[in-house]
Amino acid sequence: MANLNKRPDWIKVKAPNSTEYYNTKDLIKNLRLNTVCEEAACPNIGECWSKKHTTVMILGSVCTRACRFCNVKTGRPDLLDPYEPQRLAEAVQKLNLKHVVITSVDRDDLEDGGASHFAECISEIRKSSPNTTIEILTPDFLRKEGAAEIIANAKPDVFNHNVETVPSLYKTIRPGARYYNSLSLLHNIKKLSPEIFTKSGMMVGLGEEINEVVQVIDDLREAKVDFLTIGQYLQPTKNHAEVAKYVTPEEFKYLERVAKTKGFLMVSANPLTRSSYHADEDFQKLKENYQQKLVS
Protein backbone atom coordinates (compact mmCIF):
# COMPACT_ATOMS: atom_id res chain seq x y z
CA MET A 1 0.00 0.00 0.00
CA ALA A 2 1.30 3.47 -0.91
CA ASN A 3 2.47 5.81 1.84
CA LEU A 4 -0.07 8.64 1.67
CA ASN A 5 1.83 10.68 4.26
CA LYS A 6 4.53 11.27 1.66
CA ARG A 7 3.55 13.37 -1.32
CA PRO A 8 4.63 12.07 -4.72
CA ASP A 9 7.19 13.99 -6.76
CA TRP A 10 4.54 15.45 -9.09
CA ILE A 11 2.97 17.32 -6.14
CA LYS A 12 6.11 19.02 -4.83
CA VAL A 13 6.63 22.76 -5.39
CA LYS A 14 9.43 25.19 -4.59
CA ALA A 15 9.27 27.30 -1.43
CA PRO A 16 8.50 30.99 -2.17
CA ASN A 17 11.53 33.28 -1.98
CA SER A 18 11.34 35.93 -4.73
CA THR A 19 11.37 39.69 -4.15
CA GLU A 20 8.04 40.02 -5.97
CA TYR A 21 6.51 37.43 -3.63
CA TYR A 22 7.48 39.45 -0.56
CA ASN A 23 6.37 42.73 -2.15
CA THR A 24 2.92 41.25 -2.80
CA LYS A 25 2.79 39.86 0.74
CA ASP A 26 3.67 43.27 2.23
CA LEU A 27 1.06 45.14 0.18
CA ILE A 28 -1.70 42.73 1.20
CA LYS A 29 -0.67 43.03 4.84
CA ASN A 30 -0.53 46.84 4.74
CA LEU A 31 -4.02 47.06 3.21
CA ARG A 32 -5.37 44.62 5.83
CA LEU A 33 -6.72 42.20 3.25
CA ASN A 34 -7.15 38.45 3.59
CA THR A 35 -6.19 36.01 0.86
CA VAL A 36 -7.32 32.45 0.30
CA CYS A 37 -3.76 31.77 -0.87
CA GLU A 38 -2.58 32.04 2.74
CA GLU A 39 -5.70 30.91 4.59
CA ALA A 40 -6.11 27.74 2.53
CA ALA A 41 -2.36 27.00 2.44
CA CYS A 42 -2.35 26.87 -1.37
CA PRO A 43 0.68 25.03 -2.80
CA ASN A 44 0.95 27.52 -5.68
CA ILE A 45 1.33 30.65 -3.54
CA GLY A 46 5.02 31.15 -4.37
CA GLU A 47 4.50 31.06 -8.12
CA CYS A 48 1.36 33.18 -8.11
CA TRP A 49 2.55 35.90 -5.74
CA SER A 50 5.84 36.17 -7.61
CA LYS A 51 3.72 37.14 -10.62
CA LYS A 52 1.59 39.51 -8.49
CA HIS A 53 -1.41 37.19 -8.83
CA THR A 54 -3.47 36.80 -5.70
CA THR A 55 -6.96 35.71 -4.71
CA VAL A 56 -8.39 38.12 -2.18
CA MET A 57 -10.78 36.73 0.43
CA ILE A 58 -13.52 39.14 1.50
CA LEU A 59 -16.18 39.07 4.23
CA GLY A 60 -13.64 38.36 6.97
CA SER A 61 -11.36 35.44 7.75
CA VAL A 62 -13.75 33.23 9.76
CA CYS A 63 -16.19 30.89 8.00
CA THR A 64 -19.60 29.79 9.28
CA ARG A 65 -19.09 26.33 7.76
CA ALA A 66 -16.67 23.58 8.77
CA CYS A 67 -15.83 21.70 5.58
CA ARG A 68 -13.46 18.79 6.17
CA PHE A 69 -11.12 19.76 3.33
CA CYS A 70 -10.70 23.46 4.05
CA ASN A 71 -8.02 25.19 6.14
CA VAL A 72 -9.94 28.45 6.60
CA LYS A 73 -10.88 29.17 10.22
CA THR A 74 -14.41 28.35 11.29
CA GLY A 75 -16.46 29.86 14.10
CA ARG A 76 -18.09 33.16 14.93
CA PRO A 77 -17.61 35.40 11.88
CA ASP A 78 -16.06 38.85 11.83
CA LEU A 79 -18.11 42.03 11.66
CA LEU A 80 -18.63 43.16 8.09
CA ASP A 81 -16.03 45.78 7.11
CA PRO A 82 -17.72 48.54 5.05
CA TYR A 83 -14.36 49.86 3.84
CA GLU A 84 -13.11 46.53 2.49
CA PRO A 85 -14.34 47.16 -1.10
CA GLN A 86 -12.33 50.39 -1.28
CA ARG A 87 -9.18 48.75 0.12
CA LEU A 88 -9.56 45.90 -2.34
CA ALA A 89 -9.89 48.34 -5.23
CA GLU A 90 -6.74 50.11 -4.00
CA ALA A 91 -4.82 46.82 -3.95
CA VAL A 92 -5.93 45.98 -7.49
CA GLN A 93 -4.74 49.40 -8.65
CA LYS A 94 -1.38 49.24 -6.84
CA LEU A 95 -0.66 45.72 -8.09
CA ASN A 96 -1.75 46.83 -11.57
CA LEU A 97 -3.79 43.67 -11.96
CA LYS A 98 -5.23 42.87 -15.37
CA HIS A 99 -7.40 40.15 -13.82
CA VAL A 100 -8.46 39.82 -10.18
CA VAL A 101 -10.02 36.88 -8.36
CA ILE A 102 -12.23 37.58 -5.34
CA THR A 103 -13.46 34.84 -3.04
CA SER A 104 -14.95 34.74 0.45
CA VAL A 105 -15.73 32.71 3.49
CA ASP A 106 -19.28 31.41 3.88
CA ARG A 107 -21.48 33.93 5.70
CA ASP A 108 -24.65 32.05 6.63
CA ASP A 109 -25.25 34.75 9.26
CA LEU A 110 -25.86 37.48 6.65
CA GLU A 111 -29.29 37.93 5.07
CA ASP A 112 -27.94 37.71 1.52
CA GLY A 113 -24.92 35.54 2.34
CA GLY A 114 -22.62 38.43 1.43
CA ALA A 115 -23.84 38.81 -2.16
CA SER A 116 -24.24 42.60 -1.91
CA HIS A 117 -20.70 42.90 -0.50
CA PHE A 118 -19.38 41.05 -3.56
CA ALA A 119 -21.35 43.50 -5.71
CA GLU A 120 -19.83 46.50 -3.89
CA CYS A 121 -16.33 45.11 -4.40
CA ILE A 122 -16.97 44.69 -8.12
CA SER A 123 -18.33 48.24 -8.34
CA GLU A 124 -15.33 49.79 -6.57
CA ILE A 125 -12.84 47.96 -8.77
CA ARG A 126 -14.70 49.04 -11.91
CA LYS A 127 -14.42 52.69 -10.78
CA SER A 128 -10.65 52.73 -10.25
CA SER A 129 -9.52 49.97 -12.63
CA PRO A 130 -12.08 49.84 -15.45
CA ASN A 131 -9.89 47.65 -17.66
CA THR A 132 -9.34 44.97 -15.01
CA THR A 133 -11.40 41.84 -15.54
CA ILE A 134 -13.08 40.42 -12.44
CA GLU A 135 -13.58 36.80 -11.43
CA ILE A 136 -15.50 35.90 -8.30
CA LEU A 137 -15.47 32.58 -6.46
CA THR A 138 -18.50 32.55 -4.20
CA PRO A 139 -20.11 30.39 -1.51
CA ASP A 140 -23.32 28.54 -2.35
CA PHE A 141 -25.74 31.16 -0.92
CA LEU A 142 -27.81 28.30 0.49
CA ARG A 143 -31.33 29.51 1.35
CA LYS A 144 -30.38 33.13 0.47
CA GLU A 145 -33.23 34.29 -1.75
CA GLY A 146 -32.22 36.94 -4.28
CA ALA A 147 -28.46 36.41 -3.89
CA ALA A 148 -28.02 35.05 -7.43
CA GLU A 149 -29.82 38.08 -8.85
CA ILE A 150 -27.53 40.46 -6.93
CA ILE A 151 -24.45 38.69 -8.28
CA ALA A 152 -25.75 38.51 -11.85
CA ASN A 153 -26.62 42.22 -11.82
CA ALA A 154 -23.08 43.08 -10.64
CA LYS A 155 -21.78 41.55 -13.90
CA PRO A 156 -18.47 39.90 -12.97
CA ASP A 157 -16.58 38.64 -16.01
CA VAL A 158 -16.37 35.15 -14.49
CA PHE A 159 -18.62 33.56 -11.88
CA ASN A 160 -17.02 30.59 -10.14
CA HIS A 161 -18.63 28.32 -7.59
CA ASN A 162 -17.01 24.99 -6.78
CA VAL A 163 -18.99 21.81 -6.25
CA GLU A 164 -15.79 20.54 -4.54
CA THR A 165 -16.51 16.80 -4.53
CA VAL A 166 -18.93 14.08 -5.61
CA PRO A 167 -22.44 13.97 -4.05
CA SER A 168 -21.79 10.77 -2.08
CA LEU A 169 -19.05 12.52 -0.06
CA TYR A 170 -20.99 15.67 0.81
CA LYS A 171 -22.14 14.45 4.23
CA THR A 172 -18.58 13.81 5.39
CA ILE A 173 -16.59 16.36 3.37
CA ARG A 174 -18.97 19.29 2.81
CA PRO A 175 -21.74 18.74 5.39
CA GLY A 176 -23.18 22.26 5.37
CA ALA A 177 -23.76 22.29 1.61
CA ARG A 178 -26.14 20.66 -0.85
CA TYR A 179 -24.81 19.38 -4.18
CA TYR A 180 -27.93 20.20 -6.20
CA ASN A 181 -28.10 23.68 -4.70
CA SER A 182 -24.60 24.32 -6.06
CA LEU A 183 -25.62 23.09 -9.51
CA SER A 184 -28.73 25.26 -9.38
CA LEU A 185 -26.72 28.36 -8.45
CA LEU A 186 -24.38 27.89 -11.41
CA HIS A 187 -27.29 27.31 -13.78
CA ASN A 188 -29.22 30.32 -12.45
CA ILE A 189 -26.30 32.71 -12.94
CA LYS A 190 -25.99 31.59 -16.56
CA LYS A 191 -29.74 31.99 -17.12
CA LEU A 192 -29.78 35.45 -15.52
CA SER A 193 -26.69 36.73 -17.36
CA PRO A 194 -25.66 34.48 -20.27
CA GLU A 195 -22.67 36.73 -21.03
CA ILE A 196 -21.00 35.86 -17.69
CA PHE A 197 -18.56 32.96 -18.02
CA THR A 198 -19.33 30.29 -15.42
CA LYS A 199 -16.75 28.07 -13.80
CA SER A 200 -16.69 25.24 -11.27
CA GLY A 201 -14.15 22.87 -9.81
CA MET A 202 -13.69 19.76 -7.76
CA MET A 203 -10.99 17.88 -5.88
CA VAL A 204 -10.12 14.24 -6.39
CA GLY A 205 -8.32 11.87 -4.05
CA LEU A 206 -10.96 11.93 -1.31
CA GLY A 207 -12.24 8.42 -1.93
CA GLU A 208 -14.53 9.05 -4.89
CA GLU A 209 -15.01 6.55 -7.72
CA ILE A 210 -14.09 7.49 -11.29
CA ASN A 211 -17.66 7.01 -12.50
CA GLU A 212 -18.80 9.52 -9.84
CA VAL A 213 -16.34 12.10 -11.17
CA VAL A 214 -17.63 11.57 -14.71
CA GLN A 215 -21.20 12.06 -13.45
CA VAL A 216 -20.22 15.39 -11.84
CA ILE A 217 -18.62 16.42 -15.14
CA ASP A 218 -21.91 15.63 -16.90
CA ASP A 219 -23.94 17.49 -14.25
CA LEU A 220 -21.81 20.62 -14.55
CA ARG A 221 -22.10 20.68 -18.31
CA GLU A 222 -25.86 20.22 -17.98
CA ALA A 223 -25.79 23.33 -15.76
CA LYS A 224 -24.14 25.21 -18.68
CA VAL A 225 -20.80 25.62 -16.91
CA ASP A 226 -18.13 26.93 -19.31
CA PHE A 227 -14.90 26.12 -17.48
CA LEU A 228 -14.11 23.05 -15.36
CA THR A 229 -11.15 22.63 -12.99
CA ILE A 230 -10.09 19.35 -11.34
CA GLY A 231 -7.20 19.15 -8.87
CA GLN A 232 -5.67 16.86 -6.26
CA TYR A 233 -6.95 17.16 -2.69
CA LEU A 234 -4.12 17.85 -0.23
CA GLN A 235 -4.69 17.47 3.51
CA PRO A 236 -4.04 20.89 5.14
CA THR A 237 -3.57 19.50 8.68
CA LYS A 238 -3.99 16.19 10.49
CA ASN A 239 -7.40 17.43 11.68
CA HIS A 240 -8.76 17.48 8.14
CA ALA A 241 -9.98 14.67 5.89
CA GLU A 242 -7.20 12.27 4.94
CA VAL A 243 -5.99 11.83 1.38
CA ALA A 244 -7.46 8.56 0.10
CA LYS A 245 -5.37 8.53 -3.06
CA TYR A 246 -2.82 10.56 -5.01
CA VAL A 247 -4.32 10.64 -8.47
CA THR A 248 -1.62 10.25 -11.12
CA PRO A 249 -0.96 12.78 -13.90
CA GLU A 250 -2.08 10.11 -16.39
CA GLU A 251 -5.43 9.77 -14.62
CA PHE A 252 -5.84 13.55 -14.70
CA LYS A 253 -5.19 13.51 -18.44
CA TYR A 254 -7.91 10.91 -18.83
CA LEU A 255 -10.40 13.07 -16.89
CA GLU A 256 -9.42 16.07 -19.00
CA ARG A 257 -10.03 14.13 -22.22
CA VAL A 258 -13.42 12.95 -20.97
CA ALA A 259 -14.43 16.47 -19.93
CA LYS A 260 -13.35 18.02 -23.23
CA THR A 261 -15.72 15.73 -25.12
CA LYS A 262 -18.66 17.17 -23.14
CA GLY A 263 -18.53 20.67 -24.62
CA PHE A 264 -16.82 22.84 -21.97
CA LEU A 265 -15.06 25.90 -23.35
CA MET A 266 -12.08 25.05 -21.13
CA VAL A 267 -10.88 22.24 -18.88
CA SER A 268 -7.92 22.31 -16.50
CA ALA A 269 -7.17 18.98 -14.82
CA ASN A 270 -3.85 18.26 -13.16
CA PRO A 271 -2.58 17.63 -9.62
CA LEU A 272 -1.82 21.28 -8.85
CA THR A 273 -4.87 22.79 -10.54
CA ARG A 274 -6.72 25.15 -8.20
CA SER A 275 -9.72 27.38 -8.93
CA SER A 276 -7.71 30.55 -9.44
CA TYR A 277 -4.39 29.06 -10.59
CA HIS A 278 -3.32 30.87 -13.80
CA ALA A 279 -6.74 32.58 -13.74
CA ASP A 280 -5.58 35.60 -15.75
CA GLU A 281 -4.10 33.51 -18.57
CA ASP A 282 -7.05 31.12 -18.50
CA PHE A 283 -9.52 34.00 -18.86
CA GLN A 284 -7.84 35.09 -22.08
CA LYS A 285 -7.99 31.50 -23.39
CA LEU A 286 -11.62 31.29 -22.32
CA LYS A 287 -12.50 34.35 -24.41
CA GLU A 288 -10.54 33.03 -27.39
CA ASN A 289 -12.26 29.64 -27.19
CA TYR A 290 -15.65 31.35 -27.00
CA GLN A 291 -14.91 33.40 -30.12
CA GLN A 292 -13.74 30.28 -31.97
CA LYS A 293 -16.93 28.50 -30.99
CA LEU A 294 -19.01 31.37 -32.39
CA VAL A 295 -17.38 31.18 -35.83
CA SER A 296 -17.16 27.38 -36.04
UniProtKB/Swiss-Prot annotation:
Its cofactor is [4Fe-4S] cluster. Keywords: 4Fe-4S, Cytoplasm, Iron, Iron-sulfur, Metal-binding, S-adenosyl-L-methionine, Transferase. It holds the Pfam family Radical_SAM. It catalyses: [[Fe-S] cluster scaffold protein carrying a second [4Fe-4S](2+) cluster] + N(6)-octanoyl-L-lysyl-[protein] + 2 oxidized [2Fe-2S]-[ferredoxin] + 2 S-adenosyl-L-methionine + 4 H(+) = [[Fe-S] cluster scaffold protein] + N(6)-[(R)-dihydrolipoyl]-L-lysyl-[protein] + 4 Fe(3+) + 2 hydrogen sulfide + 2 5'-deoxyadenosine + 2 L-methionine + 2 reduced [2Fe-2S]-[ferredoxin]. One of its GO terms (cellular component) is cytoplasm. Gene3D superfamilies: Aldolase class I. Pathway: Protein modification; protein lipoylation via endogenous pathway; protein N(6)-(lipoyl)lysine from octanoyl-[acyl-carrier-protein]: step 2/2. Belongs to the radical SAM superfamily. Lipoyl synthase family. This is Lipoyl synthase.
